[in-house]
Amino acid sequence: MNKQAATEKLVAVDIGNTSVNIGIFEGEQLLANWHLGSVAQRMADEYASLLLGLLQHAGIQAGELNRVIMCSVVPPLTTTFEEVFKTYFKATPLVVGAGIKSGVKIRMDNPREVGADRIVNAAAARVLYPGACIIVDMGTATTFDTLSESGEYIGGAIAPGIATSAQAIVEKTSKLPKIEIIHPAKAIGSNTVSAMQSGVYFGYIGLVEELVRRIQAELGQKARVVATGGYASLIAEGSRIFDIVRSDLTLQGLRFIYQMNKV
């Protein structure tokens, strides 16, 4: 392998409803990882300025980054980031969608309904954790994605995210305050805020654990449970349901898919 090939870098971009997760890979190594807010009104020039500043701080040259892969659940931001990379990096991103090889067979009523982020997570789990697997991605929504023993995507569940639930209870009531989402020391709250924090945190754990148990029962076997997403580490503090916590699962899936589709 020549020196140029050995130092090629890949930009992996996961565009979610709340944040944009950007990772820079050199081979298998994740060199840098940043999160930017998902703001549909933000212009490509603004995102480019933020990204270029982060790259400079990390000592990474923009000219090194001509390989880009993205998955997105926010169509307006897909267009924005395509413009960012075409204009400032002279790169045309590979966008995960129809016609892109993922290595995952989707056994759903309508495979096109499955979000790109869920396919990417499945692609990562299939490579990293072969066999039956339940992926719990805890973000704006909480998704439960199930892989069979043979690595086929067979469906899952979608529930509100913990922050979404906390926001809803504030918006739908007159007197309940906004709270910080934490791991409370006990379930019995001694005031309104601590009672809300208990209900949101431990109630959410109950939701996650019950859905995982039901999926396990329907599978008829013990599947490996992998947690990812912005709240994975916090929730794992209060639950033993997870076998693995992998915050970079989606970025790793993007890397695998890029390798499958590169010319």
Curated annotation (Swiss-Prot):
Its main location: cytoplasm. One of its GO terms (cellular component) is cytoplasm. A monovalent cation. Ammonium or potassium. ATP binds at residues 14-21, 140. The keyword Zinc does not apply. Keywords: ATP-binding, Coenzyme A biosynthesis, Cytoplasm, Kinase, Metal-binding, Nucleotide-binding, Potassium, Transferase. Gene3D superfamilies: 3.30.420.40. Pathway: Cofactor biosynthesis; coenzyme A biosynthesis; CoA from (R)-pantothenate: step 1/5. The keyword Transferase applies. It catalyses: (R)-pantothenate + ATP = (R)-4'-phosphopantothenate + ADP + H(+). The active site is at 117 (proton acceptor). It is found in: Cytoplasm. GO terms for molecular function: ATP binding; metal ion binding; pantothenate kinase activity. Its cofactor is NH4(+); K(+). GO terms for biological process: coenzyme A biosynthetic process. Catalyzes the phosphorylation of pantothenate (Pan), the first step in CoA biosynthesis. Homodimer. PANTHER family: TYPE III PANTOTHENATE KINASE. Belongs to the type III pantothenate kinase family. This is Type III pantothenate kinase. The gene is coaX.
